[in-house]
Amino acid sequence: MTKADLIVGIQWGDEGKGKIVDMLSQNYDVVCRSGGGHNAGHTIWVDGMRYALHLVPSGILHKNIINIIGNGVVVNPEVLISEMAQFDHLEGRFFISDRAHLNLAHHSLIDQAKERLKGDKAIGTTGKGIGPAYSDKISRSGHRVGELLDPKALCESLMKDFESNKPYFDALSIEIPPKDKILADLVRFKDVLAPFITNTTELLWRAMDDNKKVLLEGAQGTLLDIDHGTYPYVTSSNTVSAGACTGLGLSPKSIGKVIGIIKAYSTRVGNGAFPTEDLGSDGENLCEIGKEFGTTTGRKRRCGWLDVVGIKYSSRLNGVDTYALMKLDVLDGFKNVKICKAYEYKGEVIDYFPSDLQNATPIYEELEGWDSINGIKKYEDLPLNARKYIERIEELTGVKIGFISTSPERNDTIVR
């Protein structure tokens, strides 16, 4: 039986996982998504064409690869159907777990209403209903994708839920659509999605028993993990490597190589602690050059320098074997670049990631910048200062950088 390799984001998401998954997936037979929902987004550039994926695994761009949405994902059928429409001939190469939970229209309404009520204490969620969908799952009142196969029964169950929760919906000023509209939507979802709904855990086990090569595609980033991230400014699922096991039905022994994706600088969407955020011209330049606007929301990302303390923390949580360093070309032309190698925290210098990160101040090491690396494909062709930056990251983290992205294009990647 083969083991599954895993790609996981090491920062606050948006590291560039999609490009690496797309590049590596041609070497695999199966690509799986294990958690999150359409709040996550991968942007992939192929031959000048931009693909924005939110639920469908990135392996979908390769027609000989099986793609699986696992039980740990919360699935918005409307979004999924829209995304599937971009691709031809999905039968036999795309599957959705019947155990995955549904993220329906009322979940988004709840999400947005609760954020409004929080005012300046808002988390900064995407408003896509992810938290409420996971809340229903954990409180054992959610509904699963497999229930779409009987839309009438699902509709009746939903109407009972809405009736029992009417005071809650009224308090949030949420108006539930009429029953006939809900049923019509559920029937439409079933008509499109039924051929793809199956027991994906068994499907995955059979593939691994047959020695098929499997790649697990992480969503978002480790520092957004519900347990290990910067709580409460986190997502509602486990984004660490262990979450891939529960989100697909795999044992920890099933995991092979873990590839950690790190961006050459740091970004964050929404609120929460961000020690290396740069509010000056460097931060603005990183945002503009890196086109740091959310794939899902279009929101401008907060930008700053690389935080090695957070990277080391995430790497231990995930058992990272090697890194892929993304968007190194965005640093082209900076006179100097910075790496945060420690924090000043409550009068001490620390090199660990505290639970109250808002009280940490970065301690920087400054390195000389470099000219353009755009499109370079050999490590020895990189400017000396770019190589020094890469090697300093390796020294500080103790992990080798095996992949280096030098442009958004799939083929502009150095493999070491």
Curated annotation (Swiss-Prot):
Substrate binds at residues 295-301. Mg(2+) binds at residues 14, 41. GO terms for molecular function: adenylosuccinate synthase activity; GTP binding; magnesium ion binding. It is an enzyme of class 6 (ligase). Pathway: Purine metabolism; AMP biosynthesis via de novo pathway; AMP from IMP: step 1/2. One of its GO terms (cellular component) is cytoplasm. NCBIfam families: PRK01117.1, purA. This is Adenylosuccinate synthetase. The lineage of its organism: Bacteria, Pseudomonadati, Campylobacterota, Epsilonproteobacteria, Campylobacterales. The gene is purA.
